[in-house]
């Protein structure tokens, strides 16, 4: 991956990191990943087009499974996208499910972010928590490269490839959280 002029610091960090990863894989496991690995990585990186997606990918490789808590500003954008995708997501997944967290009623719903360029390669599908008035108040997602039948063939191929980094212990899945969620209730 060549560095382009005018890149942000995050872009430069990610480019350097991916170049290092590619070089390490070439030196250590050329026969396992081969030239196709480099092409798929470049293809995948071209799709990671928002600062949030880049941050999530770097976290995957560098934070050893440490939970990420998103900022209020990021959650506001996620919440706006979730509200816009809520009806369409109900057709793909279940509708809102009543949950009680710390004695209060909320509704959790799986939301697909695959139609959102800022969050598709970071969240994919995530659980958003809504208060009784339907206002988003929380987020729970596991950043991983798991198989999913709802993805198109190309996205599933990218996911399968990236999962190999986890299997080789070069990366680790982690939770992405914000506000009200039931993550601690299930662990």
Feature roles, as predicted:
Residues 8, 28-29, 33, 83-91:
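Short intrinsically disordered, low-complexity segments
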Residues 10-22, 26, 37, 41, ...:
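Residue-level detector of alpha-helical secondary structure
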Residues 5-8, 12-19, 23, 31, ...:
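Membrane-interacting helical modules
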